[in-house]
Amino acid sequence: MPTWWGRKSCKNKDDNHRGIISTDRDIKSSAVVVDPPLTPTRGGTPRCSREFAGASSAFSGFDSDSTEKKGHPLPRPLLSPVSIHHQDHVSGSTSGSTSVSSVSSSGSADDQSQLVASRGRGDVKFNVAAAPRSPERVSPKAATITTRPTSPRHQRLSGVVSLESSTGRNDDGRSSSECHPLPRPPTSPTSPSAVHGSRIGGGYETSPSGFSTWKKGKFLGSGTFGQVYLGFNSEKGKMCAIKEVKVISDDQTSKECLKQLNQEINLLNQLCHPNIVQYYGSELSEETLSVYLEYVSGGSIHKLLKDYGSFTEPVIQNYTRQILAGLAYLHGRNTVHRDIKGANILVDPNGEIKLADFGMAKHVTAFSTMLSFKGSPYWMAPEVVMSQNGYTHAVDIWSLGCTILEMATSKPPWSQFEGVAAIFKIGNSKDTPEIPDHLSNDAKNFIRLCLQRNPTVRPTASQLLEHPFLRNTTRVASTSLPKDFPPRSYDGNFSLQPTREPYPGRLSHDNYAKQPLSRTIKSPSRENVRAITSLPVSPCSSPLRQLGPAYKSCFLSPPHPSYAFPGQDSGYNLAEFAASPFRMKKDAMMEPSSFRTQTPNSPLRSRLV
């Protein structure tokens, strides 16, 4: 047995007793950081011990012929290829400094095995198997010094405090006891998650197991780009319109459709207006790109004109006002639709207008103009056809004027010419489309303002909303009475002058059978919430009890004070009705039988019969 066997055993026990902290500090100091020479003030530290003398001073471990102070160098750390790669980038030509921890010929195998066992219990940073790196960026400190594990830590190591920080936390502020999440596997181009997804907010989102909540229904028609189907949401029960485009990689037409549809998605995702169709989401599959939009069951203006003929002027006024409201919103966001026409304007059952088909729409900045030739030829503005100096929001105003002519005549302007001839007529001639004679002067003036060839003198959408043609119009879905208009007797036409009756709801007894109730009483405006509430009705005015002429001279009961109309006195004046010039007659159904025995003690009601 060698003479130093006992002393070495004591060293090994002492080394095991020091545990994790001393070995970890030596590994870090020997592998990466070169400690400065020992000073007398550090004499009491573990690095002054004889076991660590070889690794305490700079490059002292290279001297294999050193005497009694020569320590046993630690073995080379079991670095993964990734960590070695990072070390090579940092150390460069100084990688020889790591030979301090290399196996020396002066150390025995037992010492090495014990040191490896001690280091395996205490070190976490270097004893890591090679794992795929996540695509996240690595901080310079993490890349140059250590490679953090990407797999969860063992429970026995969860209580070990990091020695790099005095607070026991990592560089990112998290505690060292937290588990590190596993890296996500790289997504292949053919994986289902890369193909099946839904797009909401500008990016395609993966739906769970490729299952879509929207179910495709019947075919509705073909649009500019693809087909349109009816859709149903299986979770919310909401209807939608599904616009589909075939995804064909080697087809130029399919690529153009996808490009335009993606442009429409990006634009509609940023818009929110009652006169613009609402965007719900989109989904990309292996064969199609589906866009889910608000379903407007009434169809387009073009379809209504085809089915029912040209519109009357009140309908044109109502639709034009709503179209301008949507255009004013778009132009306020520096967006040009570029394809305003009847086929791209939808109408719901209540007469509400929705602008649709934004595949041609374009966002315009203050330093750019549009030069591309896009839109339908019959509705194109002259500056679009000429494409000389570019064009701006005024092109939508010209198209609006053409759409008004379309609604008034059931055909687009310049329809007597073919497509190329119409384009030539718009671009080179000084003529304007013919305006029908049956329209009012305000309507004609409105159309002439929209169809001015000089785009700089065309009014804006906000200015056109103040035109007399639209200023005094109201929605078709609502009554023509203002919100604060109280109920009055109806004399055949609507008048804003109040009647002279003390109680507006009171009717004369001579014309009740010939004259209906006021429209405001029978069907109040939906905008007046208080008028929707049912009013109390006296039995004499009930429609179930009109058996004789006695009940044709009655009046409505006064409203309850809480249901009074604006500007109407809710008081109930009995003296007013006592002065009525007529008498209420008897009712055989309400009065008791005249054959009842009459006695002095009979009730007063029986004695009066």
UniProtKB/Swiss-Prot annotation:
The active site is at 339 (proton acceptor). Residues 1-202, 487-511, 590-609 are annotated as: Disordered. Its EC number is 2.7.11.25. Residues 40-64, 90-108 have a biased composition (Low complexity). It is an enzyme of class 2 (transferase). Residues 214-470 form the Protein kinase domain. Residues 11-28 have a biased composition (Basic and acidic residues). SMART domains: S_TKc (SM00220). Expressed in flower buds, roots, leaves, seedlings, stems and immature siliques. Absent of mature pollen. Residues 594-609 have a biased composition (Polar residues). GO terms for molecular function: ATP binding; MAP kinase kinase kinase activity; protein serine kinase activity. GO terms for biological process: pattern recognition receptor signaling pathway; regulation of defense response to bacterium; regulation of defense response to fungus. Keywords: ATP-binding, Kinase, Nucleotide-binding, Transferase. ATP binds at residues 220-228, 243. CDD domains: STKc_MEKK1_plant. It catalyses: L-seryl-[protein] + ATP = O-phospho-L-seryl-[protein] + ADP + H(+); L-threonyl-[protein] + ATP = O-phospho-L-threonyl-[protein] + ADP + H(+). Belongs to the protein kinase superfamily. STE Ser/Thr protein kinase family. MAP kinase kinase kinase subfamily. Interacts with PBL27. This is Mitogen-activated protein kinase kinase kinase 3. It comes from Arabidopsis thaliana. The gene is MAPKKK3.
